[in-house]
Amino acid sequence: MGYDDTSLANVPPVEDKDLLIPRQKYLLSGVHVGTGIRTKDMEKFIYRVRPDGLCIIDIRKIDERIRTAGKFLARFDPDRVLAVSARIYGFKPVRKFAEYTGAMYITGRILPGTLTNPQAPLHLEPDVVLLSDPRVDRQIHIESVRMGIPVVALVDADNMLENIDLAIPVNNKGRRSLALVYWLLTREVLRNRKVIPPDGDLPEGYEEFATRIMGVR
């Protein structure tokens, strides 16, 4: 049996005017479609569980945490923010976030000692770290905790929240989902820094934040 991920049955009662973007845009990107595994930590973010076992994340909480994260990240000097993705679908979203906000970024394999060893080939000293998935970006997560660096993380239904200072519940594996979340975070950071007006937009849509994979549209 197939499921329509764009159905409004997947969202709690909420008006578009109360969200950063219309509900349908959230649904079309699949930000709300979580994994079939649900940790106890993440139960508070789950709206419902589909008959096939997949968790549907509450878009009100997605929206709320993106707003909160945007305000939080905007407080730091741009070049002291580090965005990370070891997962390929996060490569371009992270790069675009860094391009617009002035943040540092790492994509792909992360070398041990990046945050903890001043003699490492690539040694960085961020004041805050943004992880695309704390499980996949585990090396930076561990080092951030060791160095006392605040951690903001995109977390799916199967993630744990230990040693995460600010969690953004979301599908952190999907190509379009990651593109939309990083696009929104970028916009919120720039709005809070007053780089763009409170209702301002980026010059390109979230689709331009999506990683291009051959044969995938």
From Swiss-Prot:
Matching InterPro entries? Ribosomal_uS2 (IPR001865), Ribosomal_uS2_arc (IPR023454), Ribosomal_uS2_euk/arc (IPR005707), Ribosomal_uS2_flav_dom_sf (IPR023591)
Q: Which GO terms describe its cellular component?
A: cytosolic small ribosomal subunit
According to its UniProt entry, one GO biological process term is: translation
The entry lists its GO molecular-function terms as: structural constituent of ribosome
Q: Give one Pfam hit by family name.
A: Ribosomal_S2
Keyword field: Ribonucleoprotein, Ribosomal protein
Which family is it part of?
Belongs to the universal ribosomal protein uS2 family.
What is this protein called in UniProt?
Small ribosomal subunit protein uS2
Q: Which organism is it from?
A: Korarchaeum cryptofilum (strain OPF8)
